């Protein structure tokens, strides 16, 4: 005997022991094809019956559940409606066998009863392909733990099972449960609807309470996994003790409830998510009322989201706002009247089983009928659609047309294949099973109301599992002062432009710190760090974006620019006048003593240098930068080198020619002055080229250290570092020129240029050193204007300081610009030396 046969044999033994006879037409209806129904009419939360107990629990000994009877009535209503429908299963009568499963206590015996044949025998066979059990399909039960227990039995025979409210994602495993389907969205959609609700109201600090059974543990774990690393944090999670509302509470369980409620009181989290069966919550909420815990937002899982008995608990409305996640309401015409209709008169002669009695069900339902009627048909529709799914599958399997069906034996494996294929419209809703065996019904967020004139479970929003978001969110009557939305945050939301500094282990607990100037907060990328603005942008403190810095450069309308331009124009005119005066007296001794042709070279370069001044104004370009960094320095260096060589040549004539006649003759013969100027010019060109290669010509920008909102655009990004290198040759020439001028202070008056050269060279040396010092300590917007001003002053020092006195002598003392006068001055100098 194989393992499968031994298993079936054992089940047969249990079935033979557990079977008994009871008659009640409320639970049984004969028909051509029977449906099995498993409902919780009474609930036993603690008394779990194990397989080694050979007595079936008597469900009527436990507390009655109105909602369970309401669902059983939905199945009866659907079967009766189908039997009266001439278009669906014409000429075929559906029957049913329904059993009370006591929540989780009575699952095995009904499963065996449904699997057995009419004689209560379950034969041992090698092949069950042609086996016909008592029922063709089973509707229920309601909770995931019971569904899995029953499914393990039914799946051995591929007997179709459709659950109407079990949401565990474990039920999607078709390797374990190939014949199991459900007409309710899976747990992940319920969890996601909760999360979207909390995100909508900015609740990021919550408490979670779970029951100690599989339902509570699994859903609590799923919620924790969904929230891990997200925007919502769990302040704490506690496990509720398993309690029966009509049983005396044990001291340890009571102390546990007291501790949990005290923890809720002390927590700053005002939103409480509860995953638990309804019967486990009665004593808990009694303790909540006893401790006067108010102002909370209770988010109910689908297991108690629309429970009428818990809703009727006295004073419950004082504890806060109740929001529940449940299946959408689909009104079923005629069901409200059918729900309170009594059982059919007279016993039946058909064989039934135990736990098919509920003496108080109808009266209890009548007492809650108003609440049930106003709350609408939610899970009721899931039962209703499950029955219709089986009916449509049978309709297809029996080859029915509009008037007749071919009645024949229906095997479970055939029917389950047809159920997977069904696709029909029921009360304007499309019913079909996805690859996981679920029907994608919408979910609703309901608010509990205690005004008898309103729906006790008022819909405030809907959730589409296919879209994954809430919609049609309505106003909520908050149980708070001034009807304000409750706040449940570990930390208040940061203001715009503030970064989060984590506090503790929860991501929802943080300090808010302002972003510093020059940084901004990009919340889409990183809420915990301020990002630096790009180099050409800036921001104030606590900003979420940067703005463009204002580019700073010399402009013509500025007063400083106009003043410097006027000085440059004055220098240009003076240099042009000096060139005209020198050209008019080109053969005169005064011009020849000033350098002759070299004098015209200097004046020409000075004019060019003055013409370069305007390129300092306006935004720098490659061409203007080339003029600033190459053309002007070369021109100025040639001018200084000419002055230096002129000083050296005069000293040579009067003091060194007699001592070194041969050297002097070589100097004169090979034009030593021009060769020296050419060499110095070449050296300057090399210096400029090296500087340009090191720094480049492209204009660059830098932030103003005094005003970060300003971006200074300049030619040389390392101007301060290269300034001393670029001017080193000029400074050396100025020192040498000053030295030669000082050596010639005793020369004839017409050749004594010590005062003028000393003035020019000293001014240049002092201004250049001052500029280097200034730029080493300051890097603001004044650098360019100071640089230009020093440049113009240096040009003026040469133009006016060196050429000015000579022009003055040519214009106002022409008698001194004669060869005779110069010869007399030389003779006087010679006589003094002798």
UniProtKB/Swiss-Prot annotation:
UniProt cross-references to InterPro entries, sorted A to Z: ANF_lig-bd_rcpt, GPCR_3, GPCR_3_9-Cys_dom, GPCR_3_9-Cys_sf, GPCR_3_C, GPCR_3_Ca_sens_rcpt-rel, GPCR_3_CS, Peripla_BP_I
Topological domain ranges for the Cytoplasmic compartment: 583-597, 652-676, 744-755, 801-834
Q: Which UniProt keywords apply?
A: Cell membrane, G-protein coupled receptor, Glycoprotein, Membrane, Receptor, Sensory transduction, Signal, Taste, Transducer, Transmembrane, Transmembrane helix
Q: Which segments sit on the Extracellular face? A: 20-561, 619-630, 698-722, 777-779
Q: Where is the signal peptide?
A: 1-19
Q: Where in the cell is it found?
A: Cell membrane
- Write out the transmembrane intervals: 562-582, 598-618, 631-651, 677-697, 723-743, 756-776, 780-800
| Pfam families, sorted | 7tm_3, ANF_receptor, NCD3G
Assembly notes: Forms heterodimers with TAS1R3.
Please give the family membership noted in the entry: Belongs to the G-protein coupled receptor 3 family. TAS1R subfamily.
According to UniProt, the name of this protein is Taste receptor type 1 member 2
The gene name on file is TAS1R2
């Amino acid at each position: 005997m194989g393992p499968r046969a031994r298993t079936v044999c054992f089940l047969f033994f249990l079935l033979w022991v557990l079977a008994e006879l009871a008659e009640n037409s409320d639970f049984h209806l004969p028909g051509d094809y029977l449906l099995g129904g498993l409902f919780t009419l009474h609930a036993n939360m603690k008394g779990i019956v194990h397989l080694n107990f050979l007595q079936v629990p008597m469900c009527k000994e436990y507390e009655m559940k109105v909602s369970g009877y309401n669902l059983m009535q939905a199945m009866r209503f659907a079967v009766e409606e189908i039997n009266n429908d001439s278009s669906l299963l014409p000429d075929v009568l559906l029957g049913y066998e329904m059993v009370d499963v006591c929540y989780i206590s009575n699952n095995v015996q009904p499963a065996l009863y449904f699997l057995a044949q009419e004689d209560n025998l379950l034969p041992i066979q090698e092949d069950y392909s042609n086996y016909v059990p008592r029922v063709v399909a089973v509707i229920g039960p309601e909770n995931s733990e019971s569904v899995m227990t029953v499914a393990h039995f039914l799946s051995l025979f591929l007997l179709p099972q459709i659950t109407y409210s079990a949401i565990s994602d474990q039920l999607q495993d078709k390797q374990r449960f190939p014949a199991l389907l459900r007409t309710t969205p899976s747990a992940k959609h319920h969890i996601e609807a909760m999360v979207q609700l909390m995100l909508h109201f900015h609740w990021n600090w919550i408490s979670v309470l779970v029951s100690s059974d599989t339902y509570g543990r699994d859903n609590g774990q799923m919620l924790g996994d969904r929230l891990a690393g997200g925007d919502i944090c769990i302040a704490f999670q506690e496990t509720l003790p398993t309690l029966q509302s009509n049983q005396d509470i044990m001291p340890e369980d009571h102390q546990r409830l007291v501790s949990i409620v005290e923890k809720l009181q002390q927590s700053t989290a005002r939103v409480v998510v509860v995953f638990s069966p309804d019967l486990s919550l009665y004593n808990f909420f009694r303790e909540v009322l006893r401790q006067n815990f108010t102002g909370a937002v209770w988010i109910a899982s689908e297991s108690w989201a629309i429970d009428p008995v818990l809703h009727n608990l006295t004073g419950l409305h004082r504890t806060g706002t109740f929001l529940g996640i449940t299946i959408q309401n689909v009104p079923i015409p005629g069901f409200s009247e059918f729900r309170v209709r009594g059982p059919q008169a007279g016993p039946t002669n058909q064989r039934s089983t135990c736990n098919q009695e509920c003496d108080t069900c109808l009266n209890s339902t009548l007492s809650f009928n108003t609440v049930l009627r106003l709350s609408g048909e939610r899970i009721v529709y899931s039962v209703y659609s499950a029955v219709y799914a089986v009916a449509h599958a049978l309709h297809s399997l029996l080859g029915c047309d509009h008037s007749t069906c071919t009645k024949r034996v229906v095997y479970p494996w055939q029917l389950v294949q047809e159920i997977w294929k069904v696709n029909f419209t029921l009360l304007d809703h499309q019913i079909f099973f996805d690859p996981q065996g679920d029907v994608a019904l919408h979910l609703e967020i309901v608010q509990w109301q205690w005004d008898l004139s309103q729906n006790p479970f008022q819909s405030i929003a809907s959730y589409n599992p296919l879209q994954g978001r809430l919609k049609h969110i309505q106003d909520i009557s908050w149980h708070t002062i001034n009807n304000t939305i409750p706040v449940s945050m570990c930390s208040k939301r940061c203001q715009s432009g503030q970064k989060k500094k984590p506090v503790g282990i929860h991501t929802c607990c943080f300090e808010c710190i302002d972003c510093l100037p020059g940084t901004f907060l990009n919340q889409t990328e990183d809420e915990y760090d301020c990002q630096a603005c790009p180099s050409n942008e800036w921001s104030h403190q606590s900003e979420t974006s940067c703005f463009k810095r204002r580019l700073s450069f010399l402009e013509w309308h500025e007063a400083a620019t106009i003043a410097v331009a006027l000085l440059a124009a004055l220098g240009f005119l003076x240099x042009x006048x000096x060139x005209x005066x020198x050209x008019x007296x080109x053969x005169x001794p005064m011009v020849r003593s000033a350098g002759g042709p070299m004098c015209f070279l200097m004046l020409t370069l000075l004019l060019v240098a003055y013409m370069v001044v305007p390129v300092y104004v306006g935004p720098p370009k490659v061409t203007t930068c080339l003029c600033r960094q190459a053309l002007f320095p070369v021109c100025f260096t040639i001018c200084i080198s000419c002055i230096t060589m002129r000083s050296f040549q005069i000293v040579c004539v009067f003091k060194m020619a007699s001592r070194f006649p041969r050297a002097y003759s070589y100097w004169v013969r090979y034009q030593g002055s021009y060769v020296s100027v050419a060499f110095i010019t070449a050296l300057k060109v090399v210096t400029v080229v090296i500087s340009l290669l090191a720094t480049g010509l492209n204009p660059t920008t830098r932030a103003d250290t005094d005003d970060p909102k300003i971006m200074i655009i300049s030619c040389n990004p390392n101007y301060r570092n290269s300034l001393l290198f670029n001017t080193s040759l000029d400074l050396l020439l100025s020192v040498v020129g000053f030295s030669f001028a000082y050596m010639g202070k005793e020369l004839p008056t017409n050749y004594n240029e010590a005062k003028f050269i000393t003035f020019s060279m000293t001014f240049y040396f002092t201004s250049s050193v001052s500029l280097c010092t200034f730029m080493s300590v300051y890097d603001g917007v004044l650098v360019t204007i100071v640089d230009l001003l020093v440049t113009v002053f240096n040009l003026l020092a040469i133009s006016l300081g060196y050429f000015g006195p000579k022009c003055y002598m040519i214009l106002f003392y022409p008698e001194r610009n004669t060869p005779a006068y110069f010869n007399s001055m030389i003779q006087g100098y010679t006589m003094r030396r002798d």
